[in-house]
Amino acid sequence: MQNYIKSEKAFKEAKKVLPGGVNSPVRAFNSVDASPVFMDHGKGAYITDVDGNEYIDYVLSWGPLILGHADPSVVNAITNSAMKGTSFGTPTEIETELAKLVIERVPSIEIVRMVSSGTEATMSAIRLARGYTKREKILKFEGSYHGHGDSLLIKAGSGVATLGLPDSPGVTKGLAADTITVPYNDVEGAKLAFEKFGEEIAAVIVEPVAGNMGVVPPIDGFLEGLRELTTEYGALLIFDEVMTGFRVDYYSAQGYYVVTPDITCLGKVIGGGLPVGAYGGKKEIMEQIAPAGSIYQAGTLSGNPLAMNAGFETVRQLTPQHYDVFRSLIKRMEEGLTEISNRHEVPLSINKAGSMFGFFFTDQKVTNFDTAKTSDLEFFRNYYREMLAQGIFLPPSQFEGVFISTMHTEKEIDATLEAFDVTCKMLRG
């Protein structure tokens, strides 16, 4: 039986100085009716909390750690970089090297700008799209979370879905009016929006695989339909690949689905666990950004050497073969979860994409936010706490993706399936 004495004490102290005791809402464990676990260290596929409890980690810092915790090459790259200085506020050669690697692997990107977070990447991409097209409206999809920028925090998923809020106080009516939302995977809904607002829409922003309503892949024709619509109406297509970049495929989601956007937003994996973001695209669009053009964007720590070195070393190590292994392991997980859930008569719907997957306690096929919300949240809460007690660390929200790393093997998958079996038996009696 796990004990969380030190975590509970740490949370009590944190609540004195941090809003809700955390620096990102989902970390508070509110949606699973529990107190957060405070972590101490990680290695490979495992993470250990301050009480000494060890877990198989499927959160992986919410996706960035595709090589697992404390990869020796990444740690070495960060250490060597830090010994030279943590930041200079000037260009460094490693920025160019990481940019070249990103351009080589992401089909849509000819030029890329480094920033410090995924939110900063999507906010900047929206500004760029508006400046480039001279239009103001943005089309996004219900349940898709593109960071906490005001323009995009409209009918968002992830932590917002967990909190039961359709948007956030503080987002002005004017910004909300310039954001059009339609259901994810609904090309016809997007067509209707363009028929009504087509000449005003600057861009469509979409996760090629939704990752903040759980994992929801695109249905056939969805991404292709968006590409056709944006081309027809002169709007830009923005892929938010902050989560899916280098997670879904060696060439990211756009390479896997063979749909090329005008602008791509990246983050997570390209920082190797350090704060990072990036946005890039066609040369003619990206050259509108200052100092090459007049659309302003800047950042004190943009392209900082620690994150650039960590990201370069992470992306450099990834090979196409890694993605074959990811798919094999997740197939093993899917087959095991399905067999166990059927045996215990637990409704379960599973989605997967590359090294990420999601599961919902529902008998419906999950293709959008509405179907994601049919998941049995009370069952999820109880399931989560039991899995945690058995040493399985999952995202503490039904509406988050689950990740594996190059350090996960059949051993970890099988241990997770065994824990799931025990949990289902316990909850179903």
Curated annotation (Swiss-Prot):
GO MF term list: glutamate-1-semialdehyde 2,1-aminomutase activity; pyridoxal phosphate binding; transaminase activity
Sites of N6-(pyridoxal phosphate)lysine modification: 268
InterPro entries per UniProt: 4pyrrol_synth_GluAld_NH2Trfase (IPR004639), Aminotrans_3 (IPR005814), Aminotrans_3_PPA_site (IPR049704), PyrdxlP-dep_Trfase (IPR015424), PyrdxlP-dep_Trfase_major (IPR015421), PyrdxlP-dep_Trfase_small (IPR015422)
Signal peptide stretch: none
Keyword Cytoplasm: yes
Any one GO BP annotation for this protein: protoporphyrinogen IX biosynthetic process
Cofactor(s) of this protein: pyridoxal 5'-phosphate
Superkingdom assignment: Bacteria
UniProt-listed Enzyme Commission number(s): 5.4.3.8
Catalytic activity, reaction form: (S)-4-amino-5-oxopentanoate = 5-aminolevulinate
Coiled-coil intervals: none
Pfam families documented for this protein: Aminotran_3
Predominant localisation class: cytoplasm
Protein's pathway: Porphyrin-containing compound metabolism; protoporphyrin-IX biosynthesis; 5-aminolevulinate from L-glutamyl-tRNA(Glu): step 2/2
Alphabetized UniProt keyword annotations: Cytoplasm, Isomerase, Porphyrin biosynthesis, Pyridoxal phosphate
Gene3D superfamilies to which the protein is assigned, alphabetical: Aspartate Aminotransferase, domain 1, Type I PLP-dependent aspartate aminotransferase-like (Major domain)
GO annotations of cellular component type: cytoplasm
Subcellular location: Cytoplasm
Similarity field: Belongs to the class-III pyridoxal-phosphate-dependent aminotransferase family. HemL subfamily.
Subunit structure: Homodimer.
Name of the featured protein: Glutamate-1-semialdehyde 2,1-aminomutase 1
Origin species: Listeria innocua serovar 6a (strain ATCC BAA-680 / CLIP 11262)
Gene that produces this protein: hemL1
